[in-house]
Amino acid sequence: MLAVTAGSEQIRRAMQALEAAFLIGVEGVTEIWLVRHADCYQDMEEAEDPPLSALGRAQAQRLAERVKRAGPAAVYASPFRRALETARAITDEIKVDPRLVEMPLDISEDGTLEFHETAESATARMRAMVEDIVREHEGKRVVAISHGAAIIACLTDVLNVDPGRLRLLPYYTSISTLRVLGDRRMVGTFGDIAHLEADSLSPSGAFGATSP
């Protein structure tokens, strides 16, 4: 039971206003699904630009079933192999955008990730990518297959949060949504993996074996 004294019609209008404030159900909103690529680490043999693992291919198929039901206007992808293979499970008509790449990194001898791009640089290119998608597909739904740190850079920009303070990592094939209308930007969801079942989850967690 709602702890309010208003009538049902007032409550309904209030909830509609609340949803509109978050760009839910608003005409003209561009919705961007930021999707992390599927798993590529469980049976990895190529470290430079690995393909999807067997598990990753299964994850990509489950993602594809969900995305196809949503009917996106376009599918964008990073040029990295793991992102392209994830996108190809959805469609052969892929718009490759180098701004969706992962932040360049090395792995030190002790296993520490060392990024060679600043958070500011990653944020700027992801912001420009979002702006271009909105210009080209205004009012539509678009899917963009990217990478963990790049997606975080995009989301923290919208949330006005320091990337180093958001201790989250999107799971393989997870969907994080942005809603854009004019100069308004909202994060709708983060890390949605409703399309994955228990046997499709990577046993080593969101990072896989070594890196994002």
Question: Each predicted region: which residue ranges?
Answer:
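Short beta-strand scaffold positions
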Residues: 77-78, 124, 145-146
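Domain-level recognition of soluble alpha/beta enzyme cores
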Residues: 162-186, 196
